[in-house]
C-alpha cells in the first residue's frame, strides 16, 4: 500500500508520458537491427554496408559484394567492463562474396568466372546499455543528439544588409545530406547567380544549359508568351489570350462588335472589362505602337525567305528592330510577358550575361570553375556534371531532404529518390523568382520545421560510413595490385579504418560526453539533451542571438527554460516531456483532435511544419460535461501567434499543460509563479543535487517524480506479472508468469548495485522495496536507486524554513542552518574515490607490490595485509599507505664505506625507492572495495586468491538461490494439479522413523513445499500425473543446466586473470567511501533557483522556535525573494506547511485512539477527492492505520506545473491546519527566549545539497610543485598549487606600505629559486631573516628580450648599499 497523496491537478491527462529514454534506445535499435538478417530494412548499419558495397576494381574484373552481417555476443558484461576499464562491445561478422569476371576484349561483356563467399570478422561495435549509455574504456558515456539544419531547400533574404542600396536580395540554397551544396542568389542588379559548393559564382543559366536546355527552353519555362501582330499600316495589334490580363489603358476605343463600347480610349482596362472582351470574342486589340519597346523577344526571329536570324531570343525590342522586322515581312512577334506584371526580366538579363552557347560549353565552364587546376575535355566535364547531383554515389539528398523538397516545392516524388532532378532545380528557381518579384517572406531557418535531430544511431551510422569509404579505397588498390583470382575475401578486407573512426568518435567527439551521473535526473536529462554544436553544427562563437532564442515552433517540442547559463545558452536545449522524434528527425508533440468544437479521444503527433495552419487550444481551456469547449471564444495558437478563436475554428488541443517544458522544469512546483531566469537556475541545479544517505521525497511535488525515477534506469522494475521469490540487500529473484525467460523457467535474478562509484564520485546504491512472496505486476518498483524513495525522485529533504534576517548570517543569500540537520545526518552524503596503482616492468627491473617497504615504520603498515594491500574496512586519512609499492632505483655512486658494507652483507636488494600509493590530502574515509588485476600467466598473491575464493563463494550462493527459486516456481505451477492427488509410496522424513506421508495419502501444499523437486518423480498413483511431472522435471533439469552454464562461465572469469596493457605486471584499484557531512561553505538550493552557501551551523537551542518549542531547521533571507521574482518558493513553503501540519494532526488522531469511522471521515474531508474517498472505503482497518501513520511527516501533494494548487487551495489547507491565513507565525529567539517583533513566514521547503562541496574545493599548500619555466607555484587543487597574488593584490599591499611582506610574496614565496633554498636553510637554523634574490620571472623577461634580438646585461650600481636585513617579527 503506497502513501495517500493529494493531487491538485484539475486537467485529466489521457496520454501517458512516452518513455524518457526512447529517443536514445530506439535510435540505436533501429541502427543495429539485431533481428533476422532477411527482414532488415535498408537503413542503419545495413544501409551503410549496402551503400558502399559492391566494391569493384578499376578494370571491373572483380566485384566484392555484401551479403549480410551478424552481431555477436559481448565478451564481458556491463559490470565487468566498468570494473576492468573495458569497452562494452560486440563482435561484428560480415558475409561477403567475391565475384571474379572474364571480360570479352571485343564486346566488353562480362561473364562470371568464380564466386567465393566467406564470413569475416569485421571488428567490434560498442553496444548501448538498456539505460541508453555506452561504456567506453570503463566509463559510461552519452552520445548527445545533435540539432542541425535539415537537408532540403531554404529560401532566404539578407534584409537589405548586404548592398549599400539597402535592396533586399533573395537567395535559395539546396542542402543535401551528402554532396555538393547548391546556392542561387541575386545581386543588386537582379542578375541570378549560382554557386556550387560555395565556389565562385556564375550566371544561373549556365547550370540550365548544362542540364540540356536551350535559350528558348529556358525562356519558355519561366515566362509566358504574348503575341503582337505588325500591321502593314504601322498599327500594333495585341492578340487576346484568355489567361493573360493586361494591366493597361486602352489605346483606342474597344468595341464589342455590336456597336457598343467596352472601354473608351485612355481609360484603364479593368477585370470586368477584360471579361467582356473575352465574351465578345475579340481576337486582337490595337495598342500603342511603342508598347513593345523595351520588351524582349521570346524566340529567335528567322527570315522565312533566307533563313537568316534577324533577332535572337531575349533580345530587347527597339523601334528600329520593329521597323526592320516589318520590312523583312515578319508579321507576328512572340514577346516575353514581363512588363508591368509580377514576373520581372531578371532571368532574361541573366541569360544575356551568359556567353556559353550550348550544353557542352556550359558543362566545361562548370568543370573549369570547380576544378580550376585540371584541363577539361567535354567527356570529363559531362561525367563530372552528371556526378554532381544525379549520381547516388556522390549525392544523397536523404529521405528527409526529399521530403522537405517535396513539401516546399509542391512536388510528388517518392522519398526514395535521393538525388536532385532537373525539375527540382527549375521549380526552386521559379519559387525564388516569385518570392523576389512579390517581395514574399523568407523561410525561417530557426523554425523547427527547418531543423532536425540527428540521434545517436544516425551519428554512428555516418561515422561507420566514413570508415567504410576509407576501407573501400584500400580494397580497390589491393584488387588492382594483386591477382584477384587467387585471393579470398579476407585478403582484401581490413576493418582497421572502421575501428579507428569508431574509436575516435566514441572517445573524443564533441557529442560523445562523459555522462553526468550526479543523480537519476541528471542522467535522464543528459540523454534527452539536444546540442546545436559539434561536427556539422554551429560553433558557440559564430552562433547569433536568433538561433539561441526561444521560437514559437519550440512549443511542446523544446523546453524554453532548461538551457545552460554560460556561452552555450540556447545552443544546448532539452526535449519537452511529451516530445518524440519522428523517422525524418523532426520533433513532434501530441495534440487531441477537436471536431466541431468537441473533444475526441484521438491523439496525433505533429511536427512543426504540419502544425502550421492548425488552430490549437490550450490544455486548460474549459470543457463542459459533453466534452465540448465551454466558451464560445478560446485562447488558441495559430502560426505561432496567440489569438482568441471561435470554438468551431479550433482543430487541436494541447494534451497537458506540462507538455511545453522539460522534465527538469516540470519537477518545479508552482513554476508558473517563478521568473524564467530563476526557473532556468532551478531546473539546472536539481541536476547537481547529491543523493543523500537517506532519501526523502518532497511533500510538495508535481507528479513527475515517479516518471523520472522509473525511466532513469536507476530503479529495478518488474518486467511482467510475477512473484518475488527471494529478496535481500544484494539480490532480488522474481519468477514471471507471462512467458518471459523461458530458458530459465521464467526466473530472473537482479543483482543490486552497492556502493558503486558514479562518474561524479557520488555513491550509487540500490535498496530493495519488495519482500519474498510479494505479487508484482509490470512496472512495479522492486528496488530504489540513489536519490529515489518508493519509486519517486527524492533529491533533497523537507525542512522547516523561516524567512527572516538573523544577525547578518543570511546576508547575500547565505544560509543559516540548525545543528540538528548535521547531527541527524539529514544532509550527509557518501562519495566514493577510486585510486589506482600499477606495477610495471621497468628497465631497471620489475616494480613490486609488497608490504616490505624500506624506511617505513610498522605503524604506517598496520592496515596492510601480507601482500601490501590495505584491508577492506580500514579507516584511512591523508598520507596513509593504501598499496605498498617499491621501484628499482638506478645505480648510484657509492662511497667506499657503502661498498664495504655491500661486499660484507650483500645488501644489493635494498636499492629501491618507495613509490607506494598514498591517500591524497582532503580524503578521509573507509576502504570499501579492493580489486587486484593480475596477468593471465602471472603468479597470484595471497590477496588475489582470497578475493577469488570470496567471489567464487558468492557466485555459488547466487546459483543456489537461483535454483531454489526455480524449484519454488515449478512447485507453484504444479500445485493446482498435484494437491489432492494420491501418493504411491510412503515418504520418510529426515529423522529416523519419521514419516512425512503414508502411501495412498493425498498430496498437500505443505508436503509439496517440504519435498525436494527431484523427489516428485514417480511419486503418484496416476500415470498421467507422473508423466506430466516427468515432463516438467525434464524442463527443470534443462533450465538448471542452462543456469549452471551461466554461473560456471562467471566462476571461470573470476579465476582466469586479466588482459593488462603491455609492460603492466599487476594493477590494484582501491575504493574509499568518504562521508561528507553538511559543512559551512557547502552550496544548497531550493527548486526555484534560490541558491545559497551555508554560513553558519547554529546549535539547535539557538535557532528561532515556535510557541510549542519546535525549532526551525533553516533560516533564509526574505530579501532574496522580491527582486528574484521566484514567488513559487513562498507558495511551496505555505502548501508544505499546511501538508505537514494536517498530516501530523491526522497521525496524532490515530495515536490518541480516535474511532476509525471518525478518522476515515477526517481523511476524506482533508483530501476532498473521489478517488481517495473510494480508496479509504476499500481499505481494511490495518491497512488504513498504516496509510495514516505514513502521513506523520506530512501529506504528499502533487501540484503539476500550470495546473497546480490555487491560492484558495493553499489558504484553505493552512486555515484547516489551524494557522493564520497569511502563512506567518510568531517565532521566538532561541538565544533569549524573546518573541520576535514581527510575525515570520514559515513553512516547509524542499532543500537540495548540491555537489559543490567545500571539502572538495578547499586545500592548503606549504611547498609543492613549481612551473618549469617561470619557477612559480602551480595553480589549482589538482596540481597541489598555490594561491595567485595578482596585480590588484599587489596594489593593496602597496597602499598599506607593506614592503617587506610584498618582497616576501614576490620573491621567496614565488619564483626566487636561490632565495627559497636559503630560506629553508635559515628556518632550519632558526635564523629568521629574509634574503631575497632575483625572481626567475625576471630571467624569463630577459630571455624574451634576447629572443627579440636585444642583449640585456645587469650591472651593480656603484656606491649602492644593500638594504639592511630585517627580521620577520620586526617587519610586522
Curated annotation (Swiss-Prot):
Membrane-spanning ranges: none
| One GO term describing the cellular component | DNA-directed RNA polymerase complex
Q: Name one GO molecular function term.
A: DNA-directed RNA polymerase activity
EC number(s) on record? 2.7.7.6
Q: Which Gene3D superfamilies match?
A: 2.40.50.100, 2.40.50.150, 3.90.1100.10, DNA-directed RNA polymerase, subunit 2, domain 6, RNA polymerase alpha subunit dimerisation domain, RNA polymerase Rpb2, domain 2
Source species, domain of life:
Bacteria
Keywords recorded for this protein, A-Z: DNA-directed RNA polymerase, Nucleotidyltransferase, Transcription, Transferase
A Gene Ontology annotation in the biological process aspect, one of them, is: DNA-templated transcription
This protein's record includes keyword Acetylation: no
Task: Enumerate the InterPro entries for this protein.
Answer: DNA-dir_RNA_pol_bsu_external_1 (IPR019462), DNA-dir_RNA_pol_su2 (IPR015712), DNA-dir_RNAP_su2_dom (IPR007120), DNA-dir_RNAP_su2_hyb_sf (IPR037033), RNA_pol_bsu_bac (IPR010243), RNA_pol_bsu_CS (IPR007121), RNA_pol_bsu_protrusion (IPR007644), RNA_pol_Rpb2_2 (IPR007642)
The record's listing under Pfam families reads: RNA_pol_Rpb2_1 (PF04563), RNA_pol_Rpb2_2 (PF04561), RNA_pol_Rpb2_3 (PF04565), RNA_pol_Rpb2_45 (PF10385), RNA_pol_Rpb2_6 (PF00562), RNA_pol_Rpb2_7 (PF04560)
The record's subunit annotation is: The RNAP catalytic core consists of 2 alpha, 1 beta, 1 beta' and 1 omega subunit. When a sigma factor is associated with the core the holoenzyme is formed, which can initiate transcription.
Q: What does this protein do?
A: DNA-dependent RNA polymerase catalyzes the transcription of DNA into RNA using the four ribonucleoside triphosphates as substrates.
What NCBIfam families has UniProt attached to this entry?
A: PRK00405.1, rpoB
- Quote the protein name from its UniProt record: DNA-directed RNA polymerase subunit beta
> Per UniProt, what is the name of the gene that codes for the protein in this document?
rpoB
